[in-house]
Amino acid sequence: YHMIFQSKAMVYTMLAFPTISFVTYGVGYWTAPLLMRLHDVSATEVGMYIGLGSALGGLLGVTLGGVMGDKFKQRHPAGRLLVGYIAVFGTAPLVLWMVYTESLYMAFALNFVHHLFSAAWPGIPPSTAADLVLPRMRAVAGAYYILINTMLGLAMGPYMMGQLSDTFASTGMDSAESLRAAIACTLLIFIATLILLTLAWKHLPKDEASRLERARALGEDVEEVAA
């Protein structure tokens, strides 16, 4: 417990990336309903193009993100976190373009392209967590991250976008405009993401370098690990 939660780099990393998933899960959930409302198309057509674009973009994005993360790690102890910045600065403008374009097929294309960025980061938090704890603690650290990511990202992202859409609709917006505005507004959480990533970047080199010393101070037998 102390190895995980007394590491500032660990805590900031565990909070930063779920804020990205807050957006990506929410956008993934509401993209199809939004396009159906905006462009008056069938669920079959939207589902086919959105599904294929998300699957292919996600496959390429997560693979490229992992490769980039390992490359960046070789250059700087906190290098993997750069993938988080890339995800934010790639996802935000592309999602805005997707929800505000007047062309349905441009929206389909942008759905694919934004997944190259929005799906690039999932391998970064667990690999970063593994660098900050002893080998026997990696599963626990990963489990804590999955719990936080599930609660903040998977549970809250789609829900909060829907609630915000209902709030806008209650002011007189139609269902399409209210949902579009809700998606756009929730991108503001990326401000918190950037702050948390920067704090994690600041503390990660020291926390990783002091991993064995921190474990020894907590009474762990680190001789075998050090060997």
Regions found by a protein language model. Name each.
Residues 200-227:
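Intrinsic disorder in cytosolic terminal tails and internal cytosolic loops
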Residues 6-65, 110, 114-126, 153-165:
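Extracytoplasmic gate region of multi-pass secondary transporters
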Residues 73-75, 129-138, 171:
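Paired intracellular helix-loop junctions of major facilitator superfamily
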Residues 42-45, 79-82, 163-189:
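A membrane-interface helix-boundary motif in multi-pass transporters
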Residues 85-102:
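C-terminal ends and interior cores of transmembrane alpha-helices
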Residues 86, 92, 180-199:
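Symmetry-related core transmembrane helices of the 12-TM Major Facilitator Superfamily/SLC fold
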Residues 70-87:
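Cytoplasmic membrane-interface "Motif A"-like loop-to-helix N-cap segments
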Residues 43-47, 135-145:
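Loop-to-transmembrane helix entry/capping segments in MFS-fold secondary transporters
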